[in-house]
Amino acid sequence: MSPQTETKASVGFKAGVKDYKLTYYTPDYETKDTDILAAFRVTPQPGVPPEEAGAAVAAESSTGTWTTVWTDGLTSLDRYKGRCYHIEPVAGEENQYIAYVAYPLDLFEEGSVTNMFTSIVGNVFGFKALRALRLEDLRIPTAYVKTFQGPPHGIQVERDKLNKYGRPLLGCTIKPKLGLSAKNYGRAVYECLRGGLDFTKDDENVNSQPFMRWRDRFLFCTEALYKAQTETGEIKGHYLNATAGTCEEMIKRAVFARELGVPIVMHDYLTGGFTANTSLAHYCRDNGLLLHIHRAMHAVIDRQKNHGIHFRVLAKALRMSGGDHIHSGTVVGKLEGERDITLGFVDLLRDDFIEKDRSRGIYFTQDWVSLPGVLPVASGGIHVWHMPALTEIFGDDSVLQFGGGTLGHPWGNAPGAVANRVALEACVQARNEGRDLAREGNEIIRKACKWSRELAAACEVWKEIKFEFEAMDTL
């Protein structure tokens, strides 16, 4: 050991354990434009002051550990440590606090969502001093945003590729999600696309199982979409799920999709992992493929109100990692999603600049600078009666995806697709004429039934179907 190192390590070092708040709670700190800011919902254990809990989060997710170490003297902790700079109680909740933590940008590898999450949430959630912990939001500084490619193409490029403007895009998840042969699967794809849908979709757990290997599915689905394109004169797509057990296999499937000439592939970004997702997004940018993202496993992470990671954080991470579509909930369907909160992270996916708005769960102003936007996908328990609400809630830049709401039509798959397309076109026309979809939606759909027997049959089947449960994800 050099004399210089010996001196630096020994000066001011005192072994032992000290409160985190002595080093990591800094209420006078002024945040920098280059800091990554985090808002944590903290539930301390009984007897743990909120300042100590917030400081513990800052410490354990940056430079700290449970005891003083002599190697602290070999670096500048003031430069690299996370800081809990503000704590506020959560209204209406006992012993819950929002702890705001600032992280210096030098703590994170450029262009790596994997490293960002490993640092911020990788270890601290198991900390014994905390009864529960939830990451509510992140502010990503523009200096860090610029290190990411982001979505392979973005909203405008996708519309130009598809030559479709002025309305939401329509999709359908093929059901049953498991058990069909590749040929029968392709038949369902063809019928739905021929009936008027823009996309059909592999479900998230369709990979390469014994009953339907991936290569067979890719071939039959490609044949189906080319046939549907020829008959309708519209560009069609099927989300070919490239998710696989290894990154190499995933890329091999994406390469085959590109060779077939299809416009879009798909990935399960949470189960597949951020490193795999970013790799696939880069491949898609370089090779002209759109990338549809499914959020399988998200509710394991985001559904509990006081522990986990809110989906708005996972949505931001996906925009950085890369994807042109992502499932975002429906507000009106069978899956969790409160309206204001859902629209908050939908804006975080689509818009360039989003102001802080606590009424929608947005804790920080976010500037995405030149990062392309992501189309939100509304999917899960929706049908033709939901079309006015979906059109009003999500607007044109969205994908409305009806699985059972297409394939469950009493006359078959193609009539189910026709019903959805007619309902959508009726809602878009009514909106463009200045009508209020929220108030007049049912009337608009009933009137359209006069011109479409397929829509009338769908309306009759699903007239009593509702999913009226209280949302758990509330402010």
From Swiss-Prot:
InterPro entries for the chain: RuBisCO (IPR033966), RuBisCo_large_chain_AS (IPR020878), RuBisCO_lsu_C (IPR000685), RuBisCO_lsu_C_sf (IPR036376), RuBisCO_lsu_fd_N (IPR017443), RuBisCO_lsu_N_sf (IPR036422), RuBisCO_lsuI (IPR020888)
Similarity section: Belongs to the RuBisCO large chain family. Type I subfamily.
Class in the EC hierarchy, top level: lyase
Modified residue annotations for N-acetylproline: P3
Entry's localization field: Plastid, Chloroplast
Residues annotated with N6-carboxylysine modification: K201
Protein name: Ribulose bisphosphate carboxylase large chain
Residues that coordinate or bind substrate: N123, T173, K177, R295, H327, S379
GO CC aspect terms: chloroplast
Cofactor note: Binds 1 Mg(2+) ion per subunit.
Sites bearing N6,N6,N6-trimethyllysine, chain numbering: K14
Keywords, in A-Z order: Acetylation, Calvin cycle, Carbon dioxide fixation, Chloroplast, Disulfide bond, Lyase, Magnesium, Metal-binding, Methylation, Monooxygenase, Oxidoreductase, Photorespiration, Photosynthesis, Plastid
General remark: The basic functional RuBisCO is composed of a large chain homodimer in a 'head-to-tail' conformation. In form I RuBisCO this homodimer is arranged in a barrel-like tetramer with the small subunits forming a tetrameric 'cap' on each end of the 'barrel'.
Chain positions recorded as Mg(2+) binding sites: K201, D203, E204
Function description: RuBisCO catalyzes two reactions: the carboxylation of D-ribulose 1,5-bisphosphate, the primary event in carbon dioxide fixation, as well as the oxidative fragmentation of the pentose substrate in the photorespiration process. Both reactions occur simultaneously and in competition at the same active site.
Active-site residue numbers: K175 (proton acceptor), H294 (proton acceptor)
Record PTM text: The disulfide bond which can form in the large chain dimeric partners within the hexadecamer appears to be associated with oxidative stress and protein turnover.
The enzyme's E.C. designation: 4.1.1.39
Subunit text: Heterohexadecamer of 8 large chains and 8 small chains; disulfide-linked. The disulfide link is formed within the large subunit homodimers.
Site feature (Transition state stabilizer) residues: K334
Cofactor(s) needed: Mg(2+)
